Amino acid sequence: KVHDQLTGDFDGDGKTDLVFWAQGDQTLYFTRIPADPVLTENWKLIPVYKYYNDSQMEQHGTYPAWKRTNEHEGLAVADIDGDGLQDIVGGGLWFKYLGADKFSYNVVDGAYTFSRSTAGQLVIGGRPEIVLVVGDGLAPMYMYEYQKNTWARKEIVPKVSNGHSLAIVDFDGDGNMDIWYAEMTLGGYAEAVNRILLGDGAGNFPRDIVISKGIDLHDSEIVDLDGDGDLDILGKPYDG
């Protein structure tokens, strides 16, 4: 199982790198994209982080029976510490490149390893905030704000069902970042919500827009598809 892949310049050499979770290996891998990517032998896999399945913290919410003990997923890119280099966010952690093919790992929430991840400036000033939500299961959506060397957790949505689509964007163009998320359930979920939470720049979300209801979206994207300057949603149905 390889769930979640992400590209970015994580080592600061000006070239695009690839990171991915390999749940079968219980490892997050980093690799530089070779000049000839067709040949398998040109790829050098560098372990960033390895987890183990002999125990886990009590996790937020409830999960399907097929979830493995201490399974990690979710990936996002952001400059978390403001040093100008892109960092990796995922599995309730964030990872910083140290040089010489080494990374540090930094815990955000050890009780939310099996989650979708995103990061952005939801509170003006300071480090970007991190948002985690359950991708498979029922659990809250949390925002984490860096305060006094601690990731302070704030509940944003009390209960999300399989929120496998998640992003931070400025949807309404007011300069404050917003959260977009969409739910899904195998077999279909009549209450599945595709929703924008409109931010106020202070970590609050006083207004929301429900874009659709009853349409299950799996790992979908929000992006300007037609070049008209506003954001569109590319949805992948998940109701089979």
Task: Kindly give the residue locations of the regions a language model identified.
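Beta-propeller-forming repeat regions
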Residues: 1-240
